[in-house]
């Protein structure tokens, strides 16, 4: 069946356990031997060579191997990312690699073998802390939701218990922040805070000054001041609040898709292409198209019925 599918396939993607594709005859060399135009993409934890080639990998484990967990969390505890960043990183590089190979095939007629390692994909995303550590001599400190090297940059609570994040990028913004947001212009010339390096050094004193002001304001009032001063900021939303985010609604980013359990909302793909409407066809149940696909592949009704009786489909 796989052979029949491959006869009309442009791309074959697999992320089976290490060595499984080869044992099944689905490795790139075997598949492309009679199909030089085929694009084969192998996704694995650590790649097909090297001492880790046979090592199993899951998202959290790769986060740990890539050093991400070591720099994420608080001073007292390392934590993982709450989304599957290693899986997503590998998937995105597989996606871009396949598109590149398809474009090249249009010009050359030749397929390609693509290898994507979860570790290598996440290592690419770890570029800043990796080079900061390699050439700066020490890794970025775990600082919770704060920025490790910029202050103030992180979360602050209002009198209503809500949280706002803000970040300053230069000294002009620092002066405006003191004058217009905190309404404490004397802090702009306080020697403890006269540069970003000083503000990081005296982070706790700085945050105490900010909290003394923000503790008397609700988050809406804080955001209003930040917006007026043109200081970057964001409200800390819950996932439920994200689902009802006014910006997503204003840009009409939600679509309704039909399913067997009724209509569900789904977001549009992030890349918006002028003149192209994303397809949101009804989502079929598992196995809903099995018969039509097998018929398309040339299997007789008798064979399909036998497979169904044997529980194969």
Predicted ranges, named:
Residues 1-33, 215:
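A structured beta-alpha segment of the ubiquitous adenosine-cofactor-binding alpha/beta core
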Residues 13, 31, 40, 59, ...:
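Residue-level signal for nonpolar/aromatic packing positions in well-ordered secondary structure
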Residues 22-168, 176:
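Active-site-adjacent "lid/gating" segments in soluble enzymes
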Residues 152-229, 233:
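Aromatic-enriched alpha-helical interface/lid elements that frame and gate functional surfaces
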Residues 189-199, 236-244, 303-313:
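Short linear loop/turn motifs
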Residues 259-308:
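Flexible, small-/acidic-enriched active-site or ligand-binding loops
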């Amino acid at each position: 069946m796989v052979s029949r599918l491959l006869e009309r396939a442009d791309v074959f993607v697999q992320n089976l356990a290490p060595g499984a594709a080869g044992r099944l005859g689905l490795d790139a060399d075997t598949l492309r031997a009679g199909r030089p135009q085929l694009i084969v993409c192998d996704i694995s934890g650590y790649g097909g060579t090297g001492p880790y080639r046979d090592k199993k990998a899951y998202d959290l484990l790769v986060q740990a191997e890539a050093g991400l967990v070591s720099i994420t969390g608080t001073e007292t505890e390392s934590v993982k990312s709450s989304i599957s960043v290693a899986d997503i990183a590998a998937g995105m590089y597989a996606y871009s690699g396949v598109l590149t190979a398809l474009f090249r095939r249009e010009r050359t007629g030749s397929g390609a073998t693509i290898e994507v390692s979860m570790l290598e994909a996440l290592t690419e995303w770890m570029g800043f802390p990796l080079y900061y550590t390699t050439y700066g001599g020490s890794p970025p400190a775990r600082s919770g939701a704060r920025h490790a090297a910029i202050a103030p940059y992180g979360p602050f609570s209002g009198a209503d218990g809500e949280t706002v994040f803000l970040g300053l990028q230069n000294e002009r913004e620092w002066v405006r922040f003191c004058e217009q947001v905190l309404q404490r212009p004397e802090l702009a010339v306080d020697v403890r805070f006269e540069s970003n390096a000083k503000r990081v050094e005296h982070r706790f004193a700085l945050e105490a000054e900010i909290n003394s002001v923000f503790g008397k304001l609700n988050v809406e009032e804080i955001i209003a001041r930040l917006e007026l001063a043109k200081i970057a900021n964001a409200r800390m939303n819950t996932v439920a609040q994200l689902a009802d985010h006014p910006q997503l609604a204003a840009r009409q980013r939600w679509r309704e898709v039909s399913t067997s359990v009724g209509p569900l909302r789904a977001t549009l793909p992030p890349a918006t292409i002028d003149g192209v409407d994303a397809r949101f066809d009804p989502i079929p149940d598992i196995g809903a198209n099995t018969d039509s696909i097998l018929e398309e592949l040339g299997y007789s009704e008798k064979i399909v019925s036998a497979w169904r009786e044997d529980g194969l489909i």
